[in-house]
Every structure is written in structure tokens, then in C-alpha cells.
Amino acid sequence: MKKHIKILKKKLKNFDPKLKEECGVFGVSNAKDASALTALGLHALQHRGQEGCGIVSFDGEKYYSEKRFGLVGDNFNKEKVLKNLKGNHAIGHNRYSTTGENTLRNIQPFFADTNAGGIGVAHNGNLTNSISLRNKLVEDGAIFYTTSDTETIVQLIAKSKRPKTIDKVVDAVFQIQGGYALVMLTQNSLIGVRDPYGIRPLVIGKLGSSYVLASETCALDIIGAKFVRDVENGEIVLIENNKLESIKPFPPKKVRPCVFEYIYFARPDSILDNKTAYEHRKNIGIELAKENDVEADIVVPVPDSGNAAALGFAQYLKMNYEHGLIRNHYVGRTFIEPSQKIRSLGVKLKLNANQTTIKDKKIILIDDSLVRGTTSHKIVKMLYDAGAKEVHVKIACPEIRYPDFYGVDTPTKKELLAANKTNDEICEYIGAKSLKFLSLQGLYKAIGFEKRNDTYPQLTDHYFTGDYPVKPIDELGDNKVTQLSLLSTGSNN
């Protein structure tokens, strides 16, 4: 029985074709019920990681920690649990794993005692020099208990000989490279750090006189906090006694946030550059519509990721927008008696065709991205089986040809369909009548730029261009995902 359940869970995960953001972070300082506020913030960030969650709190004398498998709402919904997390200061973390064993010790936040006092660390992102740093630390006598690069950061902080914790943090971040957002808790401060290019997001909020740090603004909304600003690229914010100090230790660089925050990662109601992610995605759909070259009867999104782009597409062209695919939002948490028939259903466990809506229709099917193409193939077949006359696939971003090194769960280049096939070959593989990706310039225009600056790109867009703002130090080749994710904040293995 256990074997069958494991097979089913693996199949469910494999039929999620999206790139996966790896973790959400949250922190609050000097606030009543800090652990409860942190649990609410993590709940709002649940889309950034569903496999584990943790909170560390501080009451002025002691630190308290709770780490659990699964969703925030299933673990931090009881008063008894939250009462164990005493104090007016807390940080939290949602975990998304990629590979490796699933153990409680790998769930964040991590905690360590240093000669300047205790420190808790929650990390979203990935270090591109994590293996090199880890090997050097081990040579110097460090003992590691996990395979997470977050522990590497903790070890670097603990190893620093500087007397103040904030100086130890500065020492550590000078040694790390990659895309990262850190939220840390010490005996008298809340600290936020964002990488020099601002690849991973981190925002500042205010709840009365208390400060809040979070991966997205939606986590501020749920607790009634007001958005103040983004943590700037390369900035360290030190929050003590309800006062915020900005520290900028790095040479100035042009900010390059991850393009997939706009396309998919951020929750639709989160604010990115003064617009919600939903508005950005509608604008992406409008640009996709401007590049349209086929006629059809209806526009159908792949739910939920394609909804906003499909709506913008349909509104611009004055076409009918229809929910031709219905998503089962509960499949990942439902116990299903395993059988060969169930295991063979695959994508139907998550999606089903709305037959009367699509029968005898020429359909424009819109999704946010195409990675391996396996699910697109099954969805197109599902629509044809339900009676669709034609299925034209539109993708709301350019072709994904390159893997990620900054904390996103991507396949190797060998597994990325667009890296190995032409547009016509991909179209044939997924079984569509036609296939079109949004142009790179169209994507930049949708997000608010006149065009891409090829000398200093405004976004981290290496998925499409191979232009990495931070070059990987650790040479991993085609084994990149297997090796690097073992040391990533997402896997925490």
C-alpha cells in the first residue's frame, strides 16, 4: 500500500509542469503574537513552498522553534502550537524541495549559537558557489548536519570573528554569490538581506510601530501591515527597537529581479513595481494578442497560471474567454485508493475538459510557460478527445532554453524541450495545430519597459537568453539539477 501511495504522489508531482519557486520567508519584530502573525504570513506565501514549514521565535531570553511537514494551515492552526512559540519576535519559512530525503532537520529556519548570541536564518534562493564554500568550511573543521546551502550561510556567520552579529552577517554575505533573500532573527534585531542584483524578492512592511519582512506583499496584506518598500538589491536592513537602518556593503549594481516573479511565481495580488502580478500577467496576454496570427472561436486558459494572460488576450482581441479546463485544487491532499487505473490517469487527476464549452470549437489555449512539454501534450489531447476542432497553443513567455542557478527548480538543459527542438518540432510533439511563444521584447514591454537593454538587462531572464547575472562558480554541467539542488534552499536535504 505504501509503495502505491508513493507512486501516486510522485506521479502527481511529475504532472505539475511549472518551474517551481523554492521557498517563502517572513519575519516580524516587536509585535504582540509574533508567531501567530508569522503563521498568517507563511499561509499567504504557501504557493512558494508546500512541503514543510517552520517558525523560530524569541521572547527576550530564549529561542523557540517548531518545524513541521506539510502546509502551514495544517500545522500552525492550533493555539497550543503557537503558545509554544513565545515572544514578540519571529521568523518563518515555507519549504519547496527538489530532490533528496525529506527530514525535519532540513526544514528552516535554521538556528545557531555564536559568540555574539543566537541567530535564526530563513533563506529563499540559491548560492552559486555553495559547493566551493562548503568544501572549504569542511576542510577548516566545520561539521554539517544538512545538505542545504542555508547551513553554509549559518556556518559563515558563526565562523566570523567580528564581535557584533550584524558585522558577522556582512562578513558572510561578502563571501556568498547567487540569488538570495534572507530573513534573520537575533536577540535584539530582525535582519533582511537581498542579493546584489535583487534576483529574489524581499519587501518591508509596517504594522503599527512594528516592522515586517516578507517575500511578497500579499503576506503583509493578510496581517494588516502596510507596504513600505522593497529591500533594495544589495541592501541589508537592520531592524532594532522599531527603527530601521539601511546598510549597503556592496558596490552598486543595476537591479535585475527574476522575470518569473512577473510571469508565474508571485501570487496574483502581490505588488511588483507598483502593479499587481495579475495586472502584469494581463498585460503579457495583451502583448501575446498583438503577436497573434490565427483565428479561433474561444480563448481557454490552463488554470490557474494561464488565467490572467488569457483574459488580457481575449479582451484585447474581443474574443470569448471560456473556462474550457476545470482544475481540481484538492487532488494533492486527497487520499485515493491506489490502483493501476488511477496511476495511469496522470494529468486528469488535476484537470478535466469542460466538454460542452469546447466541443466543435477552434481553441486558443494559453499557458504561462512550457518546460518539458509532457503536460501540454496531454492537455491538447484531452481537448481534442473532448471534441475540440482545433487547438492553437500560445505561451505567455519566450522559449525556456536554459536552467536556473538561483533557487528555482528547473530541469537540466537536456530536459528543456525548447533547448532541443524547433518550434515546429515542439508543436508536433504536443499535438497542437499551431504553437507560438511570446517574443522577448513583447515580454519586456508588457512588464513596463520600452525594450530590453541588451547591455544591462532590466530583468534576470537567463531562462530565455542564457544571460546569467551571476556566473556559477561550481561547475556542474548537465548534472546541475541533481547536484546543485542537493545544496539548495528548496531541497534542504
Describe each model-derived feature in a short phrase.
Residues 171, 219, 226-227, 231-235, ...:
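Phosphate/diphosphate-binding loops
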Residues 33-35, 98-99, 129, 199-200, ...:
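Flexible loop/turn segments at secondary-structure boundaries
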Residues 142, 162-163, 293-297, 315-322, ...:
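Secondary-structure transition/capping motifs at alpha-helix termini
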Residues 318-363, 374, 401-408:
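Short, glycine/charge-rich flexible loops or terminal/linker lids adjacent to PRPP-binding catalytic cores
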Residues 76, 146, 151, 321-332, ...:
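A conserved beta-strand->alpha-helix junction
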Residues 1-233, 238-296, 302, 390:
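Conserved short alpha-helical segments that host acidic/polar catalytic motifs at enzyme active sites
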Residues 122, 185, 193-194, 205, ...:
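Generic beta-strand/beta-sheet core signal
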Residues 173, 188-189, 224-230, 381-493:
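PRPP-dependent phosphoribosyltransferase catalytic core
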